[in-house]
Structures are given as structure tokens and as C-alpha cells.
A protein has these predicted regions:
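Charged, solvent-exposed interaction patches on well-folded alpha/beta domains
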Residues: 1-44, 49, 53-72, 76-87, ...
Length: 252
């Protein structure tokens, strides 16, 4: 190895050690800095207002029992603060970190409901985009399809706890992800035999959907009913449309 190569290795090694030392020093200095402010951002609200900045700060500080502003950054445990915020059932995820300006940054992702559930006309719950069963929120009412069941509700935490619950969740997700069906389907009823009835927002027909399976095929038939049959026969001609039978659309 030449003298020039040895010299370059020494220079690079010294530069690396210097950089590591500077980063470590900056970290120590930053840990001793006091929190100046708390910045809360509710991500991707999309018209959902289940929580707000004030409530997030209350949860994070245990209703001001544990002060954050004025506390040294090194004394803050972001993980503990995240866990406190996530005790709100409508908070899907919380990220807490310290920035270089002395602020505590809090990013909150809310749960997104896809249906509001009524059980025997009494119990009232939301179902979110992950299938979780959530309580009703006094702050906000989500504009989502209503779903009723005629049997005892068996899913305590998540629809995906059972095979049938997973099928129901897939049906709700299918409706949620399609802009037309999301606007058209207002009411979903699960009957005692496990079959589904859909009630549209605009037209008067009850849709006998059958079991929550073969979603693509059944919704394709329903679209044919709306696009080809109703315009020819009249929008108020039929009271019911049955999608349960393969290759048939039965109108009554």
C-alpha cells in the first residue's frame, strides 16, 4: 500500500469519527433542550372528525397531569405517548417524535368507518375499514351505509373473527371501494338465515342479494338491472330484484 493510499484511509477514518462525534454531540444537546410546543396533525381526515387536536393532547398528557411543554426532550418517551393516544378506539395509529426546532410532533391516523351497525334496533356500532367493531362517537356521525342484523351479534372486536363475518366485511368493503355502489347502497340487512337484502338510496327496489358471496357476479347483474332493465320497463315497475340465482335476474 502506498503512502498516498495510507494517507487517504487516515483522512476518511478521521472524517468518519468526526461526523459520528458531531451527531452524538447534537443528540446530547437536543436531549437537553426543552419542548417548546406540541404540533398535532390529524392525517387524511376525509370528512371524519372522531377526534381533534385538543383530545389528542389530553390523552397524551393524561389530561395535563403529565406536562410536556417545558420538559427536556431526553425525558420524553414517545412510545408511551403514542400508546396513550391509541387508547382512543378511533385512533388507528399515532406517531410521536421530536423535531430539531424543539417541537413535539404528533401524527394521528383515524379509523375510517365503512358501515354503521344496528343490532335488534338497540345496540349501535361502527365497522371500520379493517373490520374492527367500534363504539358510537358523540363528536361525529359518519355518513356510511346502515347495516342491521336479525340475529344476536357475535363479533365482539372484529368481523373477521368468523368465516361469515369475513364475508360480510368483504361485502361492505366492496361497496365502500366502488364509488357508484357507495353512493347507491344505503341500507344492508342480514337476515336470520344469513342472506342479505340491500336497500338503494335512489330507486325503490329491494335487492335480494342472497349469501354474501360471488360479489363481482351479483353486482354485475345488479348493474345490468339498473342500466338495461329499468330504463326499458320503468323505474317504478318492480318492487324486488333477486340476484341469488346464477345467470338470472328475477324481477317482481
Amino acid at each position: 500500500m502506498s503512502k498516498e493510499e495510507k494517507k487517504n484511509i487516515l483522512i476518511y477514518s478521521f472524517s468518519g469519527l468526526l461526523l459520528i462525534s458531531l451527531i452524538a454531540f447534537a443528540g446530547i444537546k437536543n436531549n437537553g433542550r426543552e419542548i417548546e410546543d406540541v404540533k398535532v396533525e390529524i392525517l387524511d381526515q376525509e370528512g371524519i372528525f372522531f377526534t381533534d387536536q385538543l383530545e389528542v393532547v389530553d390523552l397524551m398528557t393524561d389530561k395535563s397531569a403529565d406536562y410536556v411543554v417545558g420538559v427536556e426532550m431526553g425525558d420524553i418517551d414517545p412510545k408511551t405517548l403514542e400508546e396513550r393516544v391509541e387508547t382512543n378506539p378511533f385512533v388507528k395509529d399515532a406517531q410521536v417524535y421530536r423535531d430539531l426546532k424543539g417541537n413535539l410532533q404528533v401524527k394521528v391516523e383515524q379509523s375510517k368507518p365503512i358501515a354503521r351497525l344496528f343490532i335488534d334496533g338497540k345496540k349501535d356500532r361502527y365497522i371500520d375499514e379493517d373490520g374492527r367493531v367500534l363504539p358510537i362517537n358523540a363528536k361525529h356521525t359518519a355518513r356510511v351505509p346502515l347495516m342491521e342484523t336479525e340475529f344476536e351479534f357475535i363479533w365482539e372486536r372484529n368481523l373477521n373473527e368468523s368465516k361469515f363475518g369475513k364475508q360480510v366485511f368483504e361485502l361492505l368493503t366492496f361497496i365502500e371501494k366502488d364509488e357508484f355502489w357507495k353512493a347507491q347502497i344505503a341500507h344492508v340487512i342480514i337476515k336470520k338465515d344469513g342472506e342479505i337484502e340491500l336497500y338503494p338510496q335512489v330507486t325503490k327496489q329491494v335487492v335480494e342479494f342472497g349469501k354474501p358471496e360471488d360479489l363481482e357476479r351479483k353486482f354485475s347483474k345488479l348493474m345490468t338491472f339498473y342500466k338495461e332493465i329499468l330504463p326499458k320497463k320503468g323505474w317504478n315497475t318492480y318492487d324486488r330484484v333477486n340476484l341469488k340465482f346464477e345467470n338470472q335476474i328475477i324481477c317482481e
